């Protein structure tokens, strides 16, 4: 008589493995779009925060120049797209009032913030004189990078 082999019940059957993988695939399939939209939203929020950092920094510069009697924002970039590129960021803002002060030197890390793709923002400044004789100073910041989640979002601020 042959000895009976005992069956071991440790491990998974093929059916249990297939069902587990199907459940895992379903969970991953539903989580990926949620994760993607969260990532995109986070990048858009970061871009808005960077534009606000630029605005605040330029307003601080404006206040300093106002106290010195010559209120102004850093000049508009003279490149075709008015982008705050490295050439503009390294150019002296006002050689008479503050020699050696460049847009990038206004920031603690020595760099003008960029969008989440590493591309510069659009920047423009202008002033307008009201009928009362009051001069209003404006800055416009805009994300012109078509690949950015905050594409075409802009902020106009005045003082």
PLM segments and residue spans:
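N-terminal secretory signal peptides that target proteins for export/translocation
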Residues: 1-6
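Conserved alpha-helical elements of the SDR catalytic core
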Residues: 31, 38, 58
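Short, glycine/small-hydrophobic-rich surface segments
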Residues: 58-106
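Extended alpha-helical scaffolding regions
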Residues: 96, 105-112, 121, 133-135
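Aliphatic-rich helix starts adjacent to a transmembrane/signal segment
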Residues: 21-25, 34-53
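Short, surface-exposed interaction loops/tails
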Residues: 117-159
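N-terminal single-pass transmembrane signal-anchor helix
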Residues: 7-35
